[in-house]
Every structure is written in structure tokens, then in C-alpha cells.
Amino acid sequence: MKNTFELIDKPTFFGAIALLLTIVFPLILFPAQGADWIAVAKTFMTDQLGFLYLTLGLAACAFMVYVVFSDMGQIKLGEADEEPEFKTASWAAMLFCGGIGASILYWGCIEWAYYYQSPPFQLEPGSEEAVRWAATYGLFHWGPIAWSIYLIPAIPIAYFFYVRKQPVLKISSALMPVLGEHRSKGVPGKIVDILFIFGLLGGAATTLGLAAPLITEGLNHLFGLPKNNLTQAMVLLVCTAIFAYSSYAGLEKGIKILSNINFWGAMGLLTFVLIAGPTIFMLETGLDSIGRLLSNFFVMATWAEPFGGYGTFENTHFPQDWTIFYWAWWLVFAPSMGLFVARISRGRTIKQMVSGSIFFGSLGCFLFFMILGNYGLSLQLSGELDVVAILNAEGATKAIFSMLAQLPMSTLVIAVFTLLCIIFTATTFDSISYILASVVQNNVTEEPMRWNRMFWAFTLSFLPTILMFLGGLSTLQTAAIVGGLPLLVISVMLMISAVRATSLDLRHQDTYIEPTINIEELPDMDPWSAEGMALAQFEKEKDAAQEAAELERVAYTELAAVKKEIRAYVLEQGSQMETHELPENLQQALEQAESNLSATQAKKIELSEQAQNARIMFNQVVADLPLA
């Protein structure tokens, strides 16, 4: 343990734990006050800063389009002759199951019901237009923008890990072209990584907050187990045991196998519901929803309800409660998902990673909403089951299983659905614990150390379990979203970082004929590296010193000209004179020239010393570099 613990990035490891405890203990000791403060912060974030999240969503989409159609997208993540580490089916299953979790089972079934009774655009609840938008908005919130936000960190992280061969999986390392090596490895970089871990732990608590009641409801239907905190704690314990073992086994034997089981199980469930339910209705409604989404994509992506509360405009708070909150939610999970996507995409081009993630991720989410969601909508519209009434009276989990109970062989369907909830939760937390272990480890050329993965696996379940019993889980969920606010700036920096790094390296490559670009020649010195920044500083100081020397020469010339003018005046007068006997204009010119010369000489000496110190610093940085 002693030797392996030396690989741990201790400031990040202990800093993240300290920040988490600093937030959690006040929530435990003062739950009401903590909840009020977090609620105020969340309202400020969504109401006053919501336009920033909407802008980021569009910027993320635009950036992914740029990546796909630029030379950056053709860069291969790995060696020139390297095949993808995972087959496409396994890769798609891993990124979908690892990035979505049981949340898709929850919201895929019931999200439409919230839109149905509280629709966007000031529509009448339960109206025909409300029905159409209820079937559409889920696709929007879980579609290309969500996956584009997920992928912002994935590009620079994958590039630095597989192309530049940096054995770390950290957000701070991916920011090196923007922050510089010194800041990236220093305090600013540690703060970025700590904030990421805190946001991820809080976000994970939210996922468990959805999954545990959902699984408990399923067990209640199947076995009559009571729906209380103790049962939910037992559920979390089972999920923890599954993903702890999977995390211990690693990517190939753990996450990959669980994801494949989950993927095919989910496809089987969706196929059965599609066949057993109102097939034509689900297909036609799904197709109509896709068309409505495409026709109104930019309207939905930019709508912030700006006129709400003015005149006759009603302030429904829909975009703040749903779209903006969703974008903030995806942003909190983006670093972890980006790290995970980067880790499993070896052997693919950046274009394949980006386009594949958006396509398979959006497609998977669309299928859940188009089949499970539209099945519930059909029950509501046909009068077979008042899903909305059950939702309002008994909660979302009861409404979901009441829907499933209407299917043929409902007991088997509920059993499969509950099992999928367990495995979805396990795969999500498996990938999160893997990423957390990677972030706090200084070298991950292979896989994070097993004890490190196990530590985070149990931390992920222990924290939500305690807060669930104490009633502070929902507050932590909101706190994580609020705490992710700095990620708005970090996301922009990550996009800039990706462009800077790839552009620099592409300039060092020969002309390519093949569509895939293999980065073979790297610059001798990166401008953001310690030696690159030291050299740039030396060049800057040297230029300043040379400019000061030139100003000194100009000052000498000006003084000589004044003295020449004085000599001419004295000769003209035909007698010797003291300085104070000269005309006032000549006295002032002489004093000004001498003062100017003195100032430029002092400045030259100062800047020359700074240039010399910068040169010494550069030599020291180069001397401290490890031998290749």
C-alpha cells in the first residue's frame, strides 16, 4: 500500500474529500438552512445565468460539427496500425450504459407526464399541442446537445492520453494549452480536479436518488418488500457489491461485460414493449416527435421565456426548470463522461469518437422515450390508465410500475425492468468509480489501482445512503449542480485547448493523402510546457532589454544634439559661459536630455537583469527535465 499510495495525487485526493465533508456536514447539522441557501443559489443560477447554459449547448453542438469536418476529426487516437480497443457494439453499449444509467429508465417512462400537465410555450395543459410537445421534449433534452456537452472534455483528454502519451486522465492536464504546464500542475489545476470530483459525487447521489426508489418499487411489486429507507439501503448495498466487483475486475472483464448484458437486456425489453404495446402509435408518435424536434430545434435550444411575467405573458419557468437545469446537469457529468469516453475510444479517430457517441447515445435515449414514454402516453390518451393522476397522487415510481403492469406477462416485464435498473445503476457507478480513481492517480498507463477503484466505489454508495436516512440527499443533488457553475468557463477552455494542441501538432506533419491522420511528429517544445513558457518569457525579457538599449542610444543622441547646440551658442557669443548663464530654453533642453538619459540607462539595467534572470530560469527548467 505504501508504494502504491505514492502514485496518488494527494492534494486532489484529500482536497476532494475535504470539500465534500465541508458541504455535507452543514447539510446534516443544519438541513433546513442548507436547503434554503442551496435553493436560492439554484434559482439565481437558472434564472440569471440560464442564457449562458443555453449558449453553451449551442456552442457545444457547433464545436462538434467543426471537429467532425476539420482535420482535427481525422486524427487517430493511438498508433497508426492500431485497431479499436473495443468492437463497435461493445463500445456503443459501454458509452450508453456508462453515461446514462437508471435515469433513462425513470425519465424515459415518465418525463412526458410532467410536460403533459405543465407544457412549454404557455400551452393549455392536456391540450393537443401539449400532447405533441410532451412526446418531443424528452428527445430534445436527452439528444445531440446533451451528448455534445458530454464530449467537450473527451476530445482534449483523449488526445493528450493517446496521441501525446501523457499517462494521466485529468481535466487539469487537458487544460495545459490554456493554463500552461505550471498552472495545470499547480494550484489552479488541483482546484479544477477537486471541483470536478465534488460535482461528480453530488451528481452520482442524484442518480442513486432516482434509482433506489425505482428498484425498491419493483421489489415491492414482485415480493411485497416495504418501500422505506432500509429497503433502499439494501438495494444500494446490492448495487454497490455488483459495481465494486466490476470495478475491481477492470474495463475488459467488468464494465464491458456488465454493459453488454445491460445493452441486450434493454433491447429485449424495448422490443417486447414495442410489439406488445400499441406499435403503430408508438412508431408514428416517435416519427412525429423527431420531425417536430428537427423543425423546432433552434427554437427549443434558445427559448428562455424572456417575456414571462410581462403584460399578459405567463411565467411558467419551464426552460429554467427543465432545459437549463438539464444542461447544467449534463455539464456536471461531462468531465466524468468525457474521461470515460476518452478511455474506451483507443484506436478510433476523433471523428469516429464524436459522431459515434452522439449517434449511439442519442439513438439509445430516443428509443427509450419513443417506446416506453409513448406507451405511457397511449395509456393516458386512451383512458386505459390515468398515469398523470397516479403520478400526482402516489409519485413517479408508482406511476411507472402501474404502466408496466398493463403489459402482457407484467410480472416478468417488471422483473426484467427492475433487474435492468440494478445493472444500469451498477454500470454507471462502475464507470464513475473508475474515472474518480483515474483522476486522483498520477499514472494510469494501464488501469487505476484496484484499492483506489474500490475506495471510490464504496464512497459513491456510502455518502448517498447516509444522506438518504438524514433527509439531505436532494439538497446535495442541487448543491452539485450549483457547484458545477465553474464548468461553464472550464468547458470553453477545454474547447480552446483541443484546438490549440491539435493545430500545433498538425503544423508539424507532412501533407496527408489518406483520410486518417496519424500524429507522428510532435514539436520539440510545447509553448504551454514549463520549458516552452520559460523560453517565451526569456525571449520577451530579451526583446524588452534590447528595446531599452535602443532607447538609451536615442537618449545619447538627443543629449549630444543639445550639447552641440549649446556649443554653437557659446561660440556665437564669443565667451565662456556657465550652465546657469545659458538661455532658459537651452537649460531646460539640457536638463530634459540628461534626465531622459538617466532614466533610460536605469531601465536598460533593470530589464537586462530581468532578461538574465529569465535566461537562468530557462536553463534551470531544461536542466530539471527528466532524461528521455
Protein language model regions, located:
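Flexible loop linkers connecting adjacent transmembrane helices
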Residues: 2-4, 36-42, 69-88, 113-137, ...
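Membrane-interface interhelical connector segments
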Residues: 295-316, 375-411
